[in-house]
Amino acid sequence: TAIGNCNPFTCDKECKTKGNKRGYCENYNCECSKW
């Protein structure tokens, strides 16, 4: 994901691929959540 731009759908998909529960955008960054 480019700096200053976060796609919530792409972020969620990437996080789930890494074994996380979900992904969300915070301060334009992709954050992964394990719960």
Swiss-Prot record:
Principal subcellular localisation of the protein: secreted
Keyword Amino-acid biosynthesis belongs to the record: no
Domain of life assignment: Eukaryota
Tissue: Expressed by the venom gland.
Keyword Secreted: yes
Cysteine pairs bridged by disulfides in the record: C6-C25, C11-C30, C15-C32
Key words, A-Z: Disulfide bond, Ion channel impairing toxin, Neurotoxin, Potassium channel impairing toxin, Secreted, Toxin, Voltage-gated potassium channel impairing toxin
Listed InterPro entries: Scorpion_toxin-like_sf
Family: Belongs to the short scorpion toxin superfamily. Potassium channel inhibitor family. Alpha-KTx 21 subfamily.
Record text about domains: Has the structural arrangement of an alpha-helix connected to antiparallel beta-sheets by disulfide bonds (CS-alpha/beta).
Function: Toxin that blocks voltage-gated potassium channels (Kv).
Record-given protein name: Potassium channel toxin
